[in-house]
Amino acid sequence: MADDRLIVALDVPNVVQGLDLAERLGDAVSFYKIGLGMLTGGGLALANELKQERGKRIFLDMKLFDIGATVEAAVRGFASYDLDFLTVHGDPQVVRAAVQGASGSGLRILAVTVLTSLDRADLDANMIRAGDLAEITLERAARALDAGAHGVIASPQEAAAIRALPQAAGRLIVTPGVRPTGAALGDQKRVATPARAIADGADHIVVGRPIWQAGDPRAAALAVQAELPTRG
């Protein structure tokens, strides 16, 4: 049985390629992430096919960021697709609106803290306040959780510190920026292995290219799951 702690990112351009990859992965994967790049290529149709016809769990990675009323309405629309996770940016007003939009459904709202493709130099270049990157991530996580987020998206390097927050009890930590042992970093800068991410408190890890670019994606997915610690 697939380990649902692994979420495979379907970072492919259209539904046909997404379904082809899901077919190749078969029962080795039970949880998929569909991102913004796929949305115009039929992402919601793909989500519906995987969820309703194949029994997979779906994480829609939209990183919504707008005024509260707009976010609430958008989330209410997404909730009608019976999704599992949806991302918003971690501004408290956005989080509160998203949680309200998801009320009455099983959709969990995850707040983005600091993208795993960014480092301190990137924050400086974008004039984001000075400070330790881990400290900024922790502050953003705490604010989002205080606003009612069901969980946060953060680098595996910050997972342990977030898990130690009082607000994080019973909340989800989902970590992109996870690379299997020996895999190339790609565009990720703050990374860890699957084993390290889970050991440090992540509930789910997100892995994309190391799986879907592999010659045998199914074997690659199973290899990632083999790196995960045994469930306690």
Curated annotation (Swiss-Prot):
GO biological process: 'de novo' pyrimidine nucleobase biosynthetic process; 'de novo' UMP biosynthetic process
GO cellular component: cytosol
Residues given in the record as substrate binding sites: 11, 33, 61-70, 116, 179, 188, 208-209
GO molecular function: orotidine-5'-phosphate decarboxylase activity
SMART domains: OMPdecase (SM00934)
Pathway(s) where this gene product acts: Pyrimidine metabolism; UMP biosynthesis via de novo pathway; UMP from orotate: step 2/2
Catalytic activity: orotidine 5'-phosphate + H(+) = UMP + CO2
Source superkingdom: Bacteria
Main function: Catalyzes the decarboxylation of orotidine 5'-monophosphate (OMP) to uridine 5'-monophosphate (UMP).
Subunit structure: Homodimer.
Protein name: Orotidine 5'-phosphate decarboxylase
Organism: Cereibacter sphaeroides (strain ATCC 17023 / DSM 158 / JCM 6121 / CCUG 31486 / LMG 2827 / NBRC 12203 / NCIMB 8253 / ATH 2.4.1.)
